[in-house]
């Protein structure tokens, strides 16, 4: 087999290559190492097709100085930065997924093999929130085989643009349930993003997994700053001010204390 566009030394099915490499029989083949490129074509719910910096089964990439995307970023593995972990973190799920797919080839009986669950986040996958706001997310998942499902929420903090994510995950309530909540950090700035992922895994043969990534974009920091800048300068000590502000949709409450 001759592949158009490949270099001569990569034409491993050519007559010349087979003559110079007698250990290969005529119909043997070599599996090439471009699996990660193919994995980007699979809709896993991680949304890596939208942006290479998000990360997914095909790895996670950063923008290099020449503007091209390359594997120059790392994910944390055992507390250390590891550029390969952007890919290897998914290997168990990938292997189980393709093992289950191989079972589909053995029997035409649907019930004889495992199938991937589906999951959607009720609130949507692109949200906006203000610093200090509590976000609650509900995962609605089903399994075509009726398998039991395990839920795990986690923050893909290496993919965040919120600078505080360098310190690790934001605290979450309900990480191992279908409903999770967290508070947007007070120091988050307008435009910062926080990536939350729900992983749903079934208990069938070759456990199959599906994900849904929710990206929370921070908005409202400037509104909060404006609110405090426009408050009257003089207030009675220990007075409690409550009400609403025309430039901000949420009600506010704060205490003025004497200095």
Model-inferred region functions:
Residues 1-138, 142-168, 191:
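N-terminal acidic, glycine/proline-rich low-complexity segments
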Residues 112-125, 149, 214, 222-229, ...:
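Proline-centered linker/hinge motifs at extracellular inter-domain junctions
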Residues 120-122, 155-189, 228, 238-240:
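Low-complexity "stalk/linker" and mucin-like segments enriched in Ser/Thr/Pro/Ala/Gly
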Residues 127, 139-145, 157, 186, ...:
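Extracellular acidic, Ser/Thr/Pro-rich low-complexity tracts
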Residues 127-133, 235-257:
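Short, solvent-exposed loop/linker segments at the N-terminal edge
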Residues 178, 202, 211-213:
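Extended non-globular C-terminal regions
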Residues 206-221:
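C-terminal edge beta-strand
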